[in-house]
Amino acid sequence: MKRVFIDGSAGTTGLRIYERLAAREDLELLILPEELRKDTQARKEALNSCDVAFLCLPDQAAREAVSLLENDRVTVLDTSTAHRTDPGWAYGFPELGKDFQDKLLTSKRIAVPGCHASGFIALVKPLVDRGILQNTSRLSCHSVTGYSGGGKAMIAQYEVQERSELLGAPRQYGLTQSHKHLKEMAAICALEKPPVFSPIVGDFYSGMVVTVPLFVEDLSAGKTMADIQKAYEEQYTGPVVRYRPQMDEEGFLSGAGLSGKDAMEVTVCGNEERMVLIARYDNLGKGASGAAVQCLNLVLGCDQTTGLEL
């Protein structure tokens, strides 16, 4: 039986990971009393006595947690932004290819992808890898997410009885083009420049839809929407990320279509002049805790879908 410690188990992602793992008979969860959750010595002892540690912490706190590790047998799964572009860490998105799978399986340091970044990378990287898009491409992206993506503070803001009327409509943020996922988007896709990125939070708890619009002129010479469809069909053959030829729901596409699920659906819609690449998933599922548990399963050598809701 493997011992697992969740550092930051009281946060949104940490709680979801705990809920997924608590009933598993192949794992023993190390749980600190509430009064010791922020005690450095208690955390250090737990981090060094487990087999796998989840870090569900802000970036700086995650770095500090890593500095507490002295046991080189501990595998770390970090859900923060801190290590996602660090070459010494595996990037926890096995569907991106054999290199990603192999590094994940052999690494003791794994960075769990960001929620917005997961959709953008799933859509763009297979196209760059196949030369359908160039790494010099200037792309744009918008991403609509449920408010749980903002953590406990935003959840409380949206669910309080007397709240601002402004919360009833979608709200754009990241307006200065300095969102923390931009570096990750560019690095994993090997793009020279990150996209122009417009994240949007909506008045629904969880779910996410990420869109990358393209003109056919944005594609490499001679490439068409059919090449994109083929790329996704080839790339996503596993149980978690799936290509869907059509996601149209009577002319609409709901961002909450996979709320409560750990799968991701990708598709391309449009025509031979203009097209949109679309990824749909749950910001708390494949965008956070579901991806983390999938990585844990692979590290432990069990079915990657164990404990996932697909």
What residue spans do the PLM features occupy?
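N-terminal Rossmann-like NAD(P) cofactor-binding subdomain of oxidoreductases
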Residues: M1-Y173, C269-N271
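Short glycine-rich loop/turn motifs that provide flexible caps or phosphate-binding loops at active sites
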Residues: D7-T13, P113, T145, S206, ...
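C-terminal substrate-binding/catalytic lobe of Rossmann-fold NAD(P)-dependent oxidoreductases
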Residues: A10-K44, N135-R138, H142-S143, Y147-L277
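Short, electropositive, low-hydrophobicity segments enriched in small/polar residues
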Residues: T12-Y18, S118, A153, T211, ...
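Predominant activation on well-ordered alpha-helical scaffold segments within soluble catalytic domains
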Residues: Y18, I121-V128, L182-A186, Q229, ...
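Secondary-structure boundary/capping motif
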Residues: G119-F120, S220, T224, G287-A288
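C-terminal helical cap and adjacent loop that interface with cofactors, partners, or active-site loops
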Residues: T237, G255-L310
